[in-house]
Amino acid sequence: MEKHNEHKTLNHKSSKEKDQITNRLKRIEGQVRGIQNMVENDRYCVDILVQISAVQAAMKNVALHLLEDHAHHCVADAIKSGDGEQAISELLDVFKKFTKS
């Protein structure tokens, strides 16, 4: 199946929105570095696992935000332009990937 190419960017996002996503990812990156330090410093396993869970939740929130935005903008635009079936199929494929994790 050919992917929907004309909607592959975040061009519809404002600079502020992109900055918010980038800042969230930078915070998550810092959390991951903190976990790495915890491992290197032989911290208690449960404490490390709690932090890993927090990172997973933060990543899931970023992904859900992007997924929602994709549905509202990219998929909606594709439907309006008559290419909705392919965009919906692609969206469903992404949902399947999320439910596997």
From Swiss-Prot:
Subunit description: Homotetramer. Binds DNA with a stoichiometry of 2 tetramers per DNA.
Chief location of this protein within or outside the cell: cytoplasm
Intracellular or extracellular location(s): Cytoplasm
Similarity-based family: Belongs to the CsoR family.
PANTHER family: COPPER-SENSING TRANSCRIPTIONAL REPRESSOR RICR (PTHR33677:SF3), TRANSCRIPTIONAL REPRESSOR FRMR-RELATED (PTHR33677)
Pfam family, one: Trns_repr_metal
Name of this chain's protein: Copper-sensing transcriptional repressor CsoR
Region spans: Disordered: 1-22
Annotated positions binding Cu cation: 45, 70, 74
Entry GO MF terms: DNA-binding transcription repressor activity; metal ion binding; transcription cis-regulatory region binding
Note: Can also bind other divalent metal ions (zinc, cobalt and nickel), but these metals are poor regulators of DNA binding.
CDD domains: BsCsoR-like_DUF156
Phenotype of null mutants: Cells lacking this gene display a slightly enhanced ability to grow into medium containing high levels of copper.
GO cellular component term, pick one: protein-DNA complex
Task performed by this protein: Copper-sensitive repressor that has a key role in copper homeostasis. Negatively regulates expression of the copZA operon and of cutJ/ycnJ. In the absence of copper ions, binds with high affinity to the copZA promoter and represses the transcription. In the presence of copper ions, CsoR binds Cu(1+), which significantly decreases its DNA binding affinity and leads to the transcription of the genes.
Organism: Bacillus subtilis (strain 168)
Keyword tags: Copper, Cytoplasm, DNA-binding, Metal-binding, Repressor, Transcription, Transcription regulation
GO biological process: negative regulation of DNA-templated transcription
Domain of life, per lineage: Bacteria
